C-alpha cells in the first residue's frame, strides 16, 4: 500500500471490519501516507462489502486470506469461507465492474512437499492442510473466471517473503533479526 501510494497510484485498502476500528498493519503506516489513500472496512466473505470497496477500481490486488496452517486444522470451514468464497466475491466483482486486472495472491503451500526442485508451475498441487486446500480452491476459482469469463487474472504463489511489520515467526525475519542482533551462529530450530 505504502509503495503504491509513493509511486503516485490512487489506492483503496479493504480491511476486515472490527469493533475496535483497527486497520491491522495499516495502523502502523506513516500518517502522511495514510492521508493519501482510502480505507474501506468490510468483510471479504460478503459480496456487498467487496463490491462497495472495489467501486471505481481499475486493478484489484487480492491479498485477503486466512493464513496459518495450524489453525486451519481447527477451523477448516473458516478457511473455505474466507479464502475460496472471498476470492469468488472478488472475481464476481471484477467481472461485473470490468476491472482491468486481478492479482490473486496464493501461496507456495499449494505445492505441498516438493516432488522436484526447483518447483515450477507444472508441479502438482497438493492440499496437505485445510489452508493449502483452500488456497488451491481459490486458485482454481481464479483460473475458471479467466477461462470462462476472460477476467484478466494473475496468480502469484510466493515462497518466503519479508518486509516491514512481518511476524518474526517466519524464517527470513528470524534470520535477519539474528544477524542484526550480532549473533555469530544462526539458530533455526530442527532442520532435519
Residue map of PLM features:
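N-terminal Rossmann-like NAD(P)+-binding domain of SDR-like oxidoreductases, especially those catalyzing
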Residues: 1-161
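Conserved catalytic loops of nucleotide-sugar-dependent glycosyltransferases that act on lipid-linked
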Residues: 171
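A conserved pocket-lining segment of Rossmann-fold NAD(P)-dependent short-chain dehydrogenase/reductase
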Residues: 72, 123, 151-164, 174-192
Amino acid at each position: 500500500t505504502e509503495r503504491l501510494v509513493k509511486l503516485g497510484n490512487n489506492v483503496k485498502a479493504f480491511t476486515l471490519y472490527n469493533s475496535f476500528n483497527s486497520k491491522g498493519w495499516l495502523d502502523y503506516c506513516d500518517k502522511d501516507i495514510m492521508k493519501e489513500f482510502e480505507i474501506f472496512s468490510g468483510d471479504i466473505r460478503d459480496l456487498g462489502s467487496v463490491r462497495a470497496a472495489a467501486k471505481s477500481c481499475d486493478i484489484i490486488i487480492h491479498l485477503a486470506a486466512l493464513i496459518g496452517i495450524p489453525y486451519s486444522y481447527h477451523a477448516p470451514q473458516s478457511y473455505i469461507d474466507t479464502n475460496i468464497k472471498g476470492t469468488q466475491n472478488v472475481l464476481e466483482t471484477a467481472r461485473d465492474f470490468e476491472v482491468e486486472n486481478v492479482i490473486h495472491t496464493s501461496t507456495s503451500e499449494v505445492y505441498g512437499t516438493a516432488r522436484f526442485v526447483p518447483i515450477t508451475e507444472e508441479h502438482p498441487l497438493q492440499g496437505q492442510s485445510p489452508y493449502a486446500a483452500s488456497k488451491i480452491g481459490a486458485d482454481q476459482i481464479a483460473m475458471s473466471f479467466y477461462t470462462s469469463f476472460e477476467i484478466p487474472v494473475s496468480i502469484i504463489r510466493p515462497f518466503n517473503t519479508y518486509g516491514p511489520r512481518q511476524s518474526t515467526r517466519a524464517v527470513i525475519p528470524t534470520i535477519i533479526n539474528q544477524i542484526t542482533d550480532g549473533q555469530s551462529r544462526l539458530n533455526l530450530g530442527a532442520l532435519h
